[in-house]
Amino acid sequence: MVSAKKVPAIALSAGVSFALLRFLCLAVCLNESPGQNQKEEKLCTENFTRILDSLLDGYDNRLRPGFGGPVTEVKTDIYVTSFGPVSDVEMEYTMDVFFRQTWIDKRLKYDGPIEILRLNNMMVTKVWTPDTFFRNGKKSVSHNMTAPNKLFRIMRNGTILYTMRLTISAECPMRLVDFPMDGHACPLKFGSYAYPKSEMIYTWTKGPEKSVEVPKESSSLVQYDLIGQTVSSETIKSITGEYIVMTVYFHLRRKMGYFMIQTYIPCIMTVILSQVSFWINKESVPARTVFGITTVLTMTTLSISARHSLPKVSYATAMDWFIAVCFAFVFSALIEFAAVNYFTNIQMEKAKRKTSKPPQEVPAAPVQREKHPEAPLQNTNANLNMRKRTNALVHSESDVGNRTEVGNHSSKSSTVVQESSKGTPRSYLASSPNPFSRANAAETISAARALPSASPTSIRTGYMPRKASVGSASTRHVFGSRLQRIKTTVNTIGATGKLSATPPPSAPPPSGSGTSKIDKYARILFPVTFGAFNMVYWVVYLSKDTMEKSESLM
């Protein structure tokens, strides 16, 4: 029989034992948890490996999905990361894209705890993938840095997602008739290389409107604006069958700022500069020649430089027409100056012929001498010197005037005549040259014009007044009419020593100065015509829809 004192001690020991047992169980559980997690993880990895091995077990990547059965449908979409540049000379464009393809391969169905198997590019080589290629691509590059930029995913129902990062250089046919106000639709065409549409077709993943995405920040174009894109599909026939071709059109419109600064404004300023020559005097031949030649050379340089940024097309562009018309205006300004100079020279030649027409020559009439006692002495020599003879007459007249103041007029007059005739030696008169010869024409004219003019009254009465004294009346009667005839004859002698019917012209020939009528018309006609051309040109091309249609490229 157990005593009452031992009962509490037994109960206490039982409670301690239960607590120790619980502690030991907890310690055992804690020691077994890491191993169990690792085991579960090991079991999960083994499950994925088992799943992939089971998928590839007996899988032939040389055969398309549904081989021999239904058509394989490949859904595609494109995300553009960078668009540009666009080369007009090469007629191509470059862009970076994420090219996505989706199809269903029932051979890759699986059952597992994970919805999507996210795999790397190593799996791509072990399964079938579409043989998509870009029909108008000149060069396509798949990026491999730092590893091949490829994404591959398998879903439970066998749907495959395959994404690649590509840089594509594709052909862009351009018709540059409206250059630089043109717009282009650059296509990107892709399809199957080997499978006809009876085996594989392409469709858009998100429909025609949203399957191609081009963010605004992705377009880095200098000469173009990317205004949108459209998609389409078509069937192409070949000797191997009919193939489905998917096409994306990127619509580009050219920016005109560069060409306005580089070509249009310089051409307009050159034409205006060529028309400044119309306001320069037509006698300034060097200045107008420099204007014309400089502007023609400038237009030639501009036309050559404008073609550097274009392919060597065989047709004329809108810029070519503008440059050609500007060149025609500049060249016409040079031709206009040539015409002005030509007609001015003709007018000057006609004026010179009128003013320099030689006067009608008349034979010199012999001077008739009055009969007086000294006539036999003077007729002994036919070549009497007119200048010496005139000086002798003037000297005799002066002596007679001095003697008139102290003596009788009639007696001293006869004495003067005798002294005058005696004072001239016969040998001197005989040796004197002909006063009307060419050599002595100038001297004779000077001597005769130095004589005082005689009025009709003095000629008739033989009396001529003097400043210091009055001449003899008898001397004027004897020599007055002769002196008058000599002076009249000398005044009719021209510069060549010949007698002329009319005196030489006093006004100089016209120099052709002034403004030409051609210049007056050109000052109005050229600017008005050039302004009208610019108005028509810009109205036509700016209001015209120059964007290429997508249908024209198909």
From Swiss-Prot:
Q: Which GO terms describe its biological process?
A: central nervous system development; chloride transmembrane transport; gamma-aminobutyric acid signaling pathway; inhibitory synapse assembly; synaptic transmission, GABAergic
Annotated stretches, region: Disordered: 350-381, 397-435, 452-471, 495-515
Return one GO MF term: GABA-gated chloride ion channel activity
Q: Which cysteines are disulphide-bonded?
A: C172-C186
Q: Which Gene3D superfamilies match?
A: Neurotransmitter-gated ion-channel ligand-binding domain, Neurotransmitter-gated ion-channel transmembrane domain
Per its record, what triggers expression of this gene product? The alpha-4 beta-2 gamma-2L receptor is not repressed by diazepam.
Q: Which reaction does it catalyse?
A: chloride(in) = chloride(out)
- The region annotated as signal peptide is 1-35
| Amino acids binding 4-aminobutanoate | R100, T163
Q: Which residues lie on this side of the membrane: Extracellular?
A: 36-259, 306-318, 541-554
Q: How is its activity regulated?
A: Potentiated by histamine.
The annotated topology with respect to the bilayer is:
Multi-pass membrane protein
**Which SUPFAM superfamilies is this protein grouped with?**
Neurotransmitter-gated ion-channel transmembrane pore (SSF90112), Nicotinic receptor ligand binding domain-like (SSF63712)
The record's tissue-specificity note reads: Expressed in the brain.
Entry's PROSITE patterns?
NEUROTR_ION_CHANNEL
Which residues, renumbered to this chain, are glycosylated? Answer: N47, N144, N157
Which stretches are transmembrane?
Answer: 260-280, 285-305, 319-341, 518-540
Comp. bias regions, Low complexity: 410-422
- Keyword terms of this UniProt record: Cell membrane, Chloride, Chloride channel, Disulfide bond, Glycoprotein, Ion channel, Ion transport, Ligand-gated ion channel, Membrane, Postsynaptic cell membrane, Receptor, Signal, Synapse, Transmembrane, Transmembrane helix, Transport
Q: Does the keyword Cell wall biogenesis/degradation apply?
A: no
Effect recorded for S516R: In a breast cancer sample; somatic mutation
Instruction: Spell out the family assignment given in the record's similarity comment.
Output: Belongs to the ligand-gated ion channel (TC 1.A.9) family. Gamma-aminobutyric acid receptor (TC 1.A.9.5) subfamily. GABRA4 sub-subfamily.
According to the UniProt entry, the note on domains is: The GABA-binding pockets are located at the interface between neighboring alpha and beta subunits. GABAARs subunits share a common topological structure: a peptide sequence made up of a long extracellular N-terminal, four transmembrane domains, intracellular or cytoplasmic domain located between the third and the fourth transmembrane domains.
Self-association state and partner proteins as the record states: Heteropentamer, formed by a combination of alpha (GABRA1-6), beta (GABRB1-3), gamma (GABRG1-3), delta (GABRD), epsilon (GABRE), rho (GABRR1-3), pi (GABRP) and theta (GABRQ) chains, each subunit exhibiting distinct physiological and pharmacological properties.
Name of the featured protein = Gamma-aminobutyric acid receptor subunit alpha-4
- The UniProt gene name for this protein comes to GABRA4
